[in-house]
Amino acid sequence: MAGNLLSGAGRRLWDWVPLACRSFSLGVPRLIGIRLTLPPPKVVDRWNEKRAMFGVYDNIGILGNFEKHPKELIRGPIWLRGWKGNELQRCIRKRKMVGSRMFADDLHNLNKRIRYLYKHFNRHGKFR
């Protein structure tokens, strides 16, 4: 009976203690979660397109006589190029720039999102 209590309750009590700190009275540590062999090395393509193009535009100013700004080389929506901000600012900027050309449902959903974020930012956060 005492052995069962010690193995059940004692194990739960000392389960969080690191292996190096356990005393020998608790028994041999379990080796269930410990890896005994090294995992096989991952095969990684070091010259895929993303890695090959990393840093390709870093010297565009030096080599290109500073004619192009790096933000002009960014691909993506026009309202996001070379700009950063939170979601509310991003939605307001999108509505201002392309709101007149959006479908009615998309514009309605964007306006709903702006209303929700406006309420959220005014009720929660550090600067209320």
Swiss-Prot record:
**Intracellular or extracellular location(s):** Mitochondrion
Q: List the disulfide bonds.
A: none
Listed A to Z, the keywords are: Mitochondrion, Ribonucleoprotein, Ribosomal protein, Transit peptide
For whether the record's keyword set contains Mitochondrion, the answer is yes
Q: Which GO terms describe its molecular function?
A: structural constituent of ribosome
What Pfam families does the entry give? MRP-L51
Gene Ontology CC terms: mitochondrial inner membrane; mitochondrial large ribosomal subunit; mitochondrial ribosome; mitochondrion
The annotated transit peptide is positioned at 1-31
Q: Tell me the GO BP annotations in alphabetical order.
A: mitochondrial translation; translation
Q: Which family does it belong to?
A: Belongs to the mitochondrion-specific ribosomal protein mL51 family.
Assembly: Component of the mitochondrial large ribosomal subunit (mt-LSU). Mature mammalian 55S mitochondrial ribosomes consist of a small (28S) and a large (39S) subunit. The 28S small subunit contains a 12S ribosomal RNA (12S mt-rRNA) and 30 different proteins. The 39S large subunit contains a 16S rRNA (16S mt-rRNA), a copy of mitochondrial valine transfer RNA (mt-tRNA(Val)), which plays an integral structural role, and 52 different proteins. Interacts with OXA1L.
* PANTHER family named among the record's database cross-references: LARGE RIBOSOMAL SUBUNIT PROTEIN ML51 (PTHR13409:SF0), MITOCHONDRIAL 39S RIBOSOMAL PROTEIN L51 (PTHR13409)
Which protein, by its recorded name, is this? Large ribosomal subunit protein mL51
The species this protein belongs to is Homo sapiens
Report which gene this protein is encoded by: MRPL51
